[in-house]
């Protein structure tokens, strides 16, 4: 019998998750289906419960439901508890729901594949929303020398410092106090999707700095355009993070780790074709 999986979001038509997980299933010979489900904003909980009641084995969750999914879980991983949100759900016995957050694992795996080991690096994390919170612990666990977080609203960054400072060398700094280059700058904000960019001092990037945008698009993202203008060493978008977090979800569900490289290549080709069309 084919096992059922899905991703819930609103909007959801743009989701690459069905393609990614279908490709993973093909390469690992797993008998499963994976669909995108548009959940009404005020009916996510009932949509998820109905999916699991109908035999769904597991689900991914994207905006705007990650925090709501967190609150519905009966069992949570330590990563999910600290992230305060989940993107991966499990249908447990007796009608219970389990939750995990694989975003941070997807990010750090992509960062180290692109830029080398994080160990000993000075890292700046731009933004203090849910995307940032889900990635702080995995970054600190990779033995960075220092992780600085900045945000338009400094108080939000300070709240995350209080939550995570026991896990490593982690500090919140006002944007105006950023006065020297970092080894790695990560943009966790989605402002670039609407053509916006947080005003960052150019001094944080030089020719030795790698820059990473958690968002992705057919063209170079607004943040990466800015980074390239500051002569950054390398820039990359978040497509690898997307595939990486999906691979971690898949391995948690199926007990097998898929190859991400071939799926990344197909997605890049698809995005390039969309840009032409």
Swiss-Prot record:
Entry keywords, A to Z: Amino-acid biosynthesis, Aromatic amino acid biosynthesis, NADP, Oxidoreductase
Any idea which residues are catalytic in this one? 66
State if Amino-acid biosynthesis is listed as a keyword: yes
Identify the InterPro entries for this entry. Answer: Aminoacid_DH-like_N_sf (IPR046346), NAD(P)-bd_dom_sf (IPR036291), SDH_C (IPR041121), Shikimate_DH (IPR011342), Shikimate_DH-bd_N (IPR013708), Shikimate_DH_fam (IPR022893), Shikm_DH/Glu-tRNA_Rdtase (IPR006151)
Which Gene3D superfamilies does this chain map to?
Leucine Dehydrogenase, chain A, domain 1, NAD(P)-binding Rossmann-like Domain
Pathway involvement? Metabolic intermediate biosynthesis; chorismate biosynthesis; chorismate from D-erythrose 4-phosphate and phosphoenolpyruvate: step 4/7
Which residues are shikimate-binding?
Answer: 15-17, 62, 87, 103
Cellular component terms per the entry's GO annotation: cytosol
What's an example Gene Ontology biological process for this entry?
shikimate metabolic process
Q: What is its EC number?
A: 1.1.1.25
| Catalytic activity, as annotated | shikimate + NADP(+) = 3-dehydroshikimate + NADPH + H(+)
Give yes or no: UniProt keyword NADP. Answer: yes
Q: Which residues bind NADP(+)?
A: 78, 127-131, 151-156, 238
Q: PANTHER family from the xrefs?
A: BIFUNCTIONAL 3-DEHYDROQUINATE DEHYDRATASE_SHIKIMATE DEHYDROGENASE, CHLOROPLASTIC, SHIKIMATE DEHYDROGENASE
Describe the subunit structure.
Homodimer.
Q: What is this protein called?
A: Shikimate dehydrogenase (NADP(+))
Which organism does this record belong to? Shewanella frigidimarina (strain NCIMB 400)
Recall the taxonomic lineage recorded for the source organism.
Answer: Bacteria, Pseudomonadati, Pseudomonadota, Gammaproteobacteria, Alteromonadales
Gene name of the record: aroE
């Amino acid at each position: 019998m084919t096992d059922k999986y899905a991703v819930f979001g609103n909007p959801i038509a743009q989701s690459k998750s069905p393609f990614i997980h279908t490709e993973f299933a093909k390469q690992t010979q797993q008998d499963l289906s994976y669909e995108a489900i548009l959940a009404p904003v005020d009916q996510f909980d009932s949509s998820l419960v109905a999916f699991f009641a109908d035999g769904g084995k597991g689900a991914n969750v994207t905006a705007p439901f990650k925090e709501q999914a967190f609150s519905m879980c009966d069992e949570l991983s330590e990563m999910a508890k600290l992230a305060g949100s989940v993107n991966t759900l499990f249908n447990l016995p007796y009608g219970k729901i389990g939750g995990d957050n694989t975003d941070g694992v997807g990010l750090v795996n992509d960062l180290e594949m692109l830029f080398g080991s994080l160990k000993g690096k000075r890292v700046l994390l731009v933004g203090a929303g849910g995307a940032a919170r889900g990635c702080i612990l995995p970054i600190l666990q990779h033995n960075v020398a220092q992780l600085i977080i900045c945000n338009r609203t400094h108080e939000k960054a300070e709240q995350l410092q209080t939550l995570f400072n026991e896990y490593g060398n982690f500090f919140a700094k006002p944007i105006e106090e950023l006065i020297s280059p970092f080894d790695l700058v990560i943009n966790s904000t989605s402002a670039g999707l609407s053509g916006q960019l947080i005003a960052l001092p150019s001094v944080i990037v030089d020719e030795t700095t790698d820059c990473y945008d958690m968002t992705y698009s057919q063209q170079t993202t607004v943040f990466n355009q800015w980074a390239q203008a500051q002569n950054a060493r390398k820039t990359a978008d978040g497509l690898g993070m997307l595939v990486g977090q999906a691979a971690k979800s898949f391995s948690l569900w199926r007990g097998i780790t898929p190859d991400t490289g071939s799926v990344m290549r197909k997605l890049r080709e698809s995005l390039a074709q969309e840009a032409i069309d």
